Amino acid sequence: MDKQVNVVNYRELKKIPYILLLLQNGVNDHDFTRISVSDLSKQMGTTPQNISKVLRRLEREGYIVRSSVKGEVSVMLSEKGSALLRNLMDLMENLLGKNITIVLRGIVVTGFGEGSYYISLEGYRRQFISKLGFDPYPGTLNVKLLDQYMKYRLYLERVPGVRIEGFSNGSRTYGGVKAFKCTISDIPCGVLLIERTSHGPEVIEIVAPVKLRDRLGLKDGDDVTINILL
């Protein structure tokens, strides 16, 4: 069955260059990022007044959330803004006839042993099943990215992914997670970008329906290639 693609109308298309500009300056959909209106205006070849006007319009129409404290402006992409970019990506995929894929490479490393606890929490597990399409093995595969692939890791911070919402069990609050569907050796998996983590940005965690170390015979130091489907 063909994938249904939501129509991106002309009014929305006019906003995309400005939203992409924000993404290029570090804005994402899970926390506020401080921006420079002056720098944005130089990058777009327009005036700071026009950029401020555009930001107010994007905020008024619900594409971004904006905060201004002591003259410093911070911006976060809203769910509506993320949805617009997803629709654009779906449209591109439909027109090009293929998926957009980002390839990451790294080596397997030992984690802190926390993955099994967090993945087993029902508040996360239910969302992995409904949003990633599989019941996860209670644990994660930790991969340390090679230096030349870190730029793609940073790119993922800036684009919409699958939002795994945080939750509270009454005694503790658990943070949200951005996920991306991916494959490792044709096994469906999910790359997790975790808001609260003890790892540095060079280490990513992979969730899958099976224990990847056992299924693929992986040990610390082994190379891994991750194909992320946008």
Swiss-Prot record:
Residues 102-230 are annotated as: Riboflavin kinase. It comes from the Archaea. GO terms for molecular function: DNA-binding transcription factor activity; magnesium ion binding; nucleotide binding; riboflavin kinase activity; sequence-specific DNA binding. It catalyses: riboflavin + CTP = CDP + FMN + H(+). The keyword Nucleotide-binding applies. Mg(2+) binds at residues 140, 142. CDP binds at residues 111-116, 210-213. GO terms for biological process: FMN biosynthetic process; riboflavin biosynthetic process. Its EC number is 2.7.1.161. FMN binds at residues 197, 205. This is Riboflavin kinase. The gene is ribK.
